[in-house]
């Protein structure tokens, strides 16, 4: 690992552990590290994976609601972090989407780790895109996961030729 990256991650961990707020999830650690990396390096492309929503698999609805509230707060803070960075001003696009929907599983056997896939709703997912390069509105056509990748490539200036996915041109400026 590059020395500067190691130093940034170490500083983020230290602030996370010793900070004035008591962190209550690994997603908060993810946010703190992300905040430091954005502040220090302003990467052109970054993937942030908040994972605590998987608490839903435990079957405790109150924990799931807490995770949703936390996710809303951290996502808002992430957007604020992006907006405060002069390197991203009027340039950054932030797509927000769940980790995945589900592909069809003919067995419909309640799947691996309770990821049911026999239900059509398991194949639906949403995406929110904020910032430069996107416009307000909704996409009414059926969209596949590969379309999200094609859209990201278009935002990065690549045509994505040869890809199965089709960019969501209706949301792109």
Name the predicted role of every residue range.
Residues 147, 156-173:
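Polar, surface-exposed loop/tail segments
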Residues 70-113, 152:
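Metal-dependent active-site segment of extracytoplasmic phospho-/sulfohydrolases and closely related
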């Amino acid at each position: 690992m590059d020395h500067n990256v190691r130093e940034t991650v170490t500083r983020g961990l230290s602030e996370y552990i010793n900070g004035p707020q008591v962190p209550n999830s690994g997603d908060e650690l993810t946010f703190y590290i992300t905040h430091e990396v954005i502040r220090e390096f302003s990467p052109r492309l970054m993937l942030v994976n908040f994972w605590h929503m998987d608490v839903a698999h435990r079957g405790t609805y109150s924990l799931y609601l807490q995770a949703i509230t936390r996710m809303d707060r951290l996502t808002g803070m992430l957007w604020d972090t992006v907006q405060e960075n002069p390197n991203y001003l009027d340039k950054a696009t932030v797509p927000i989407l769940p980790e995945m929907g589900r592909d069809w599983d003919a067995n419909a056997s309640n799947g691996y780790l309770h990821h049911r896939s026999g239900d059509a709703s398991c194949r639906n997912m949403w995406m929110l895109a904020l910032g430069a390069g996107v416009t307000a509105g909704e996409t009414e056509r059926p969209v596949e996961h590969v379309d999200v990748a094609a859209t990201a490539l278009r935002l990065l200036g690549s045509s994505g030729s040869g890809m199965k996915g089709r960019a969501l041109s209706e949301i792109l400026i």
